[in-house]
Structure formats: C-alpha cells, structure tokens
C-alpha cells in the first residue's frame, strides 16, 4: 500500500533541495507500504531510518529511540566479565534471580525510595519490558470481571502493544490537563467503572518529562487502595529529574514514588538508562511484600497458585523466559552495590542528557518550533532524556514525514496516548554534541522552507 500523496501546500519534495536525498526518502516510504507514518512504532521508525541511511550513506540525527548515548558502567562490565570467566554461562540462573542481586535491589529501593521490600520479592527481568509483560499476565488476571490497565498517559507505546498482544482491553487518558487535585476526579471517572485491574504511569514521564508530585502520587495510592487496583510504577528514568538531587543513599530527598503511600504496588526499574546497560537486557521488578502474598482465586484460571508472587515467578516469568542472563545479573549486582555503598554516584553519570536537552530545545525554538509539554504544573518542564516539539501549521504526521527529508528522526506523540497529536517526541541520548552543528543547520533549513513569509511592510 503506497503512502498518501504529499499535500499540495508542500509542493513536490522531489523538486526541493533538502539535506537528504529526497528521491531515496520517497522511495523508502513508498516501498514500506506505510499509510500513516504517525502510527509507526519506535522500532518501525528505526528500521525505516536504517534503510534510508543504508541506501544513501547519509546519516540522520537520530532521536527516535532511547538508546543510551553514554558508555556502560565499567563496574558492571568488569563484574560480568569475571562472572563469565567463572563459567556462569553454562548454568541456568534461578528464575527468581541470584541472591546477591536480590539483596542489592532491596537495598537500592530502601536507599533511594525509602521503601522496605523483602529481597525475595525483588526479581531480575529481561529488561523492564519483560517486567511489564509479567505484570499484565498476572495482575490483570487477578479478577475475571475486570478489563485491564488504566494508563496515565502519555506513556511508553510498547506497553499498550503488550496489552494488545495479550488480548487485554485498557483505558487511557492524557494527564497533562488533569494535574494536581484535578487528578482525583479524572481517575475516579475510570475507577468507578469497576473494570480497572491496574494503573500504570512513568515517573519521570516518557515522553513529556513531567514529574508527578508526592501529592499526586498519594491521590493515586489512596484511590488504588479504595478500588483494589494495583499500581505499576515505571521508574525507567530513576532519579533523572535533575532539578533535585536523588543520588545520596539513605538521605532525603528520595525519588518520588507511590510506594511510600501504599503497599499495593509493583515497581519497574530499568538498568538501561541510569547504568547505560541497555544491551544486556536486564531490569528489576519489585513487588511489595503485601501484594506478593495476596491471594486472588481467579489466578488459578491460568496458574497453579492463587498467590500473586508465586504465579508471577513460576507462571508468568517462567513462561516468558526461564531466567534472566546469568552474567548480566552479576553485572547489575555489582553496580547496585557500588551505588548503595556510596562509591558510585549514579545520577552524576547521566546528567549529560539534561544538559543536551537544554541546548537542543533552544535550537528547536530558535528555528520556529515550540515545546509541546512545556510546563510541569507551575514550573518550566525539566531538561532530561526526552522533550516534545511541534511546528506551527503542521500536524504530527506532516511534521514527522517532512523531517525525514531534512535528516531528523523522532516519533509521533499520538503513539504515546498523548492528546497533543501535533507533536513529536525527541530523545536526547543518541545524538552527540559533535552533531549539534548539523542539527542546527538542518533545523534552520527546515524553518527556511516551512516558515511563513513575512507580510508586507506597514
């Protein structure tokens, strides 16, 4: 199926001089069979850009995927090498994780969230995506008469894909206009249906980079307790609200978390961003002690036990992957121990993302773009791993498609559950500072081609 024709107001791209080979971009789009580029997933955008780069030899400014742009923790690398030398590659790891890692995850949660969780209830997973899948497979099956997850959006698009693959229904709303006390009424409008099994959000938020406050988290916690919904808190960007220092173990301030307001929670913690360990696919799934021991008879429709923790480990996780990479567990245990002992400041190593975001946002706004999610309650949005942008007069689909011809990639906000469908998400991680001049040139070129001409002089 060919792409829809270019809108007349744009003119024929092939007749314009653009930074990328326009004919090659158009051919790649037409061959792909894509009808709506705004609906493409992160990986589909990546594949499209890889194809164009491979055919043209021209490089894009890559902002579509949150690939860490920093080297991995050397502590983790060394520990993994040593584990491999000891021969762990020949041994299946326990599904529930190795003891040293479970201890360090528990310590990390205590040190940086001020929350106590039994090490037995701290599990390694093959990335946080597997942790989310395990949650959907168990938590959303605790009650046969419930529908599924309520997503407090915008959010990570793949989590909804996981629900679709499982055949689960879900609900969603864009939280941006429902911050503060207004959040309660919005949540009630969904919880009152009696169909919500779980509530999921990311904090800091991917893609808007807003950060829910303790007061908002308390609202979520109280309503979740009242309605019996489990809160799944995605902490993929743990401690990365750089406006505050969350880096000191056991010392306030602590990373904001619903876990301090309820015992009805699951935490998804990633090693990909904070420790730049994305390639080894290892994350952390932390289940509260109370939830771990909760009985839900409807679980026995799928699992041998009605205990949530047992069903999660020996039902869902076992079926997904019989354990997480043995050597990677030793890597994560080592870096967590260094952080817990105060020997490694985990935040200092990733501040570069915030610094780059500050520069990049200025480059966009200097060239006619605007930041879509630009405030966090009554404060300017923080600089971090992501930011959102739009261009006057263009829809998100039009902007995403046009930017392909200017060598800039991103994803459409519409795929994240955002109501701001005119916008795109930019990730700051993969672009290097040495590429900033190229980004500036391409944005200026885009603005020259798309900016409205000045009106006649008065």
Predicted regions: what they are:
Residues 6-15, 107, 111, 115-117, ...:
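PLP-dependent enzyme catalytic core of the Aspartate aminotransferase-like
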Residues 18-25, 31-130, 181-182, 336-343, ...:
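N-terminal small-domain helix-loop-helix segment of the aminotransferase-like
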Residues 69, 272, 377-379, 415-418:
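AMP-binding (ANL) adenylation modules
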Residues 85-227, 232, 238-262, 266, ...:
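Conserved core of the PLP fold type I
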Residues 261-351:
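Conserved core segment of the aminotransferase class I/II
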Residues 286, 388-390, 427-429:
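Short hydrophobic/aromatic beta-strand micro-patches
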Residues 326-329, 333, 346-361, 371-390:
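Conserved glycine-rich beta-strand-loop-beta hairpin in the small C-terminal domain of fold type I
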């Amino acid at each position: 199926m060919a792409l829809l024709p270019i809108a007349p107001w744009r003119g024929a791209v092939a007749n314009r001089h653009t930074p990328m080979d326009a004919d090659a971009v158009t051919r790649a789009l037409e061959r792909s069979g894509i009808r709506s580029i705004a609906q493409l997933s992160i990986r589909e955008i990546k594949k499209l850009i890889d194809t164009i780069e491979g055919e043209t030899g021209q490089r894009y400014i890559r902002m579509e995927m949150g690939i860490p742009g920093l080297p991995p923790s050397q502590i983790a690398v060394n520990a993994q090498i040593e584990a491999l030398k000891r021969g762990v590659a020949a041994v299946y790891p326990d599904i529930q994780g190795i003891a040293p890692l479970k201890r360090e995850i528990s310590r990390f949660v205590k040190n940086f969230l001020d929350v106590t969780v039994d090490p037995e209830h701290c599990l390694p997973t093959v990335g946080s995506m597997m942790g989310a899948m395990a949650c959907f497979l168990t938590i959303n099956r605790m009650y046969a008469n419930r529908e599924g997850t309520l997503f407090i959006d915008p959010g990570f698009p793949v989590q909804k894909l996981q629900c679709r693959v499982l055949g689960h229904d879900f609900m969603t709303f864009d939280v941006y206009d429902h911050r503060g006390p207004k959040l309660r009424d919005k949540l009630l409008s969904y919880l009152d249906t009696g169909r919500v099994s779980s509530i999921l959000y990311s904090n800091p938020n991917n893609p808007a980079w807003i950060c829910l406050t303790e007061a908002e988290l308390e609202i979520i916690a109280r309503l979740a307790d009242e309605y019996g919904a489990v809160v799944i808190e995605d902490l993929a960007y743990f401690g990365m609200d750089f406006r505050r220092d969350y880096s000191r173990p056991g010392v306030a301030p602590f990373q904001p978390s619903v876990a301090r307001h309820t015992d009805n929670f699951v935490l998804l913690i990633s090693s990909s961003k904070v420790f730049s360990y994305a390639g080894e696919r290892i994350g952390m799934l932390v289940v509260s002690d109370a939830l771990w021991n909760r009985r839900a008879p409807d679980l026995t429709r799928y699992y041998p036990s009605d205990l949530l923790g047992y069903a999660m480990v020996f039902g869902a996780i076992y079926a997904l992957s019989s354990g997480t990479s043995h050597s990677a567990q030793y890597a994560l245990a080592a870096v967590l121990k260094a952080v817990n002992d105060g020997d490694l400041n985990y935040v200092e190593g990733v501040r570069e993302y915030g610094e780059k975001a500050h520069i990049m946002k200025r480059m966009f706004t200097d060239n006619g773009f605007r930041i879509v999610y630009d405030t966090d309650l009554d404060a300017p949005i923080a600089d971090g791993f992501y930011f959102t942008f739009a261009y006057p007069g263009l829809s998100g689909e039009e902007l995403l498609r046009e930017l392909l011809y200017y060598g800039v990639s991103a994803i459409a906000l519409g795929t994240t559950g955002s109501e701001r469908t005119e916008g795109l998400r930019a990730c700051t991680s993969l672009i290097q500072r040495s590429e900033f001049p190229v980004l500036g040139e391409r944005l200026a070129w885009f603005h020259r081609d798309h900016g409205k001409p000045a009106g006649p002089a008065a």
